[in-house]
Amino acid sequence: MNDSVKTSLKRTLVGRVVSNKMDKTVTVLIEHRVKHPIYGKYVVRSKKYHAHDEANTCNEGDLVEIQETRPVSKTKAWTVSRLVEAARVI
């Protein structure tokens, strides 16, 4: 009767890893553009999230996708779901 497939309703965001100094944790910077309500200019807003990285595979500069999850610790409620693009080494 009810053969529908469950879809994940968890939020996903894509951002850049700015710190991986903690064990099994990375800091991800998410940037988005918002139109200023009065002046109409597009302004870049940013926010940092702590995300759980179980295998310690992410490095600084990597582009990753994070997914909302249950709280892992006091400041972590996101987990790294996949690596979108590795950082380029110059």
Swiss-Prot record:
UniProt-listed PROSITE patterns: RIBOSOMAL_S17
Keyword Membrane set for record: no
Cellular component aspect of the GO annotation: cytosolic small ribosomal subunit
InterPro entries attached to this UniProt entry: NA-bd_OB-fold, Ribosomal_uS17, Ribosomal_uS17_bact/chlr, Ribosomal_uS17_CS
SUPFAM superfamilies membership: Nucleic acid-binding proteins (SSF50249)
Similarity annotation: Belongs to the universal ribosomal protein uS17 family.
Functional summary from the UniProt entry: One of the primary rRNA binding proteins, it binds specifically to the 5'-end of 16S ribosomal RNA.
Name under which the protein is recorded: Small ribosomal subunit protein uS17
